[in-house]
């Protein structure tokens, strides 16, 4: 998810 938890697993950058 884009900006979900900032996890690499979630594929987001935490924004």
From Swiss-Prot:
Catalytic reactions on record: 2 superoxide + 2 H(+) = H2O2 + O2
Protein induction: By water stress.
Coiled coil: none
GO terms, molecular function: metal ion binding; superoxide dismutase activity
Location in the cell: Plastid, Chloroplast
Complexes and interactors: Homodimer.
Family: Belongs to the Cu-Zn superoxide dismutase family.
Protein name, per record: Probable superoxide dismutase [Cu-Zn], chloroplastic
């Amino acid at each position: 998810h884009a900006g979900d938890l900032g996890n690499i697993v979630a594929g987001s950058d935490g924004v």
